[in-house]
């Protein structure tokens, strides 16, 4: 794999296990990972790209029975074969809808929404800023409560007011996804927070924040937390998977 001094490949295909078909590429373009900067290539060209990690792990499952994948994610219930990248989850509010990294569509109409983190969680969350745009509270609106999510509403208000502070976990993003699922009639769908763990003090803090937020929301939403390391451990022991897929992931991310 050739790359430059910035750790970026010359072509997107060089960063991926297998080329993307046109439909998958169109889905990925709904996000911002393929947008180049003024002096920098698109983030998806970086060896440490979160988008490349998502594609390399999940694109294999497009059109396949996703039962082993759901099991590896710790999600129970029936699995389908349809997988969507950068799936929009409209909240009913003005502006572009939030997108979730992966949506696994089940045959009963529900979906499993996967929010993926590679190294993003290691960057500390900014302090002294309002974490939601005004539209989420415009005119005293309680959008999560109106969608049947009062615990999410309480957490959103605590985050906005600074009563709940998190160093590593992007909880507002999870709350937006929970709102999008609920507004679209998918409240019983699972929301998975999947991250690439790294040892150290930051990891312990991140885990503690996750445990605290899950405890606040678990009675209301099906929020599952797992690591890429745990996911790969299960997948690598699953019979019937293409060895090229498993070997690529092991060499690239888990050696």
Model-derived segments and spans:
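Charged, terminal alpha-helix-loop-beta segments
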Residues: 1-255
